[in-house]
Amino acid sequence: MLGLGQSAQAYASDDALNMNQAKDKTYSVPGCGRASDLKYPHRDGHSSSHEQRSGILPTECPGPTLNTGAGSIGIPGCGKVTNRVVSDYNKNARSTLANFDSSKMTEARMNSKNVPIGCQDTSDPHFNGPIDQHVPGAGSPQSQPHHIDAWNSVSSRRADNNNQDMMDPQTASSDRYNEKMMREENSGVSASSYTTKVQGYPASIPSFNQETEEKETYAYGVGDRHNVPRNQIMDETNPSANVLNATDHSISHPENKVLHK
């Protein structure tokens, strides 16, 4: 069964254990393992959160259980899954979870507060970790298919590791500008081109030195002291004022900063 703090993905990957457990189980629902020694909280309008019901998949829950092959114990809950048969190093065929059709799945999150009335909580009731992880299947008889990203763990602090489009730090909000910038300039042609990747925090963004065609070295970054638009230079007589860069008219993107020379 799904253990304390164990993700459904880790549960599904242990095919050998699941197959051994399946030998001692009986099945009253097609494609679903049933066992009197497995208990989970079931909520409806007539029961409390402390009441328990035996089994893996309630009979009133539509749809197949997620399982790792014929005759194996399914992951608690219901959902759609495509099984794929692969061969290991000993050329023994085994079934493994392959492609999830997330548009036809309902989910429960590992947080009992998010389970609505009448739904099957597939998570351990004592799990109070910082991660709300999608577990395929909520077991809700009234559930409607909707899209989720299977196995996408999202922190409760809303931090993620997705790459984002580069934004001007002057216009980006502090919670969204969670980026680390790496910029490469090819300035040997009339128009400059950049390759940008963002990830991290502004405070950790280093400056990168780039030698131009005139052998002048510029440093680019966010943490430097002076912010000067790329098509301007700092007035030597008045450091607080900027003047147009007469040597480089081709660069017209003010979000690309020349910070010091």
UniProtKB/Swiss-Prot annotation:
Residues 157-175 have a biased composition (Polar residues). The keyword Ligase does not apply. Its main location: mitochondrion. Residues 22-63, 121-148, 157-176, 242-261 are annotated as: Disordered. Residues 36-53, 250-261 have a biased composition (Basic and acidic residues). Keywords: Mitochondrion. It comes from the Eukaryota. It is found in: Mitochondrion. Transmembrane segments: none annotated. GO terms for cellular component: mitochondrion. This is Uncharacterized protein YNL195C. It comes from Saccharomyces cerevisiae (strain ATCC 204508 / S288c) (Baker's yeast). The lineage of its organism: Eukaryota, Fungi, Dikarya, Ascomycota, Saccharomycotina.
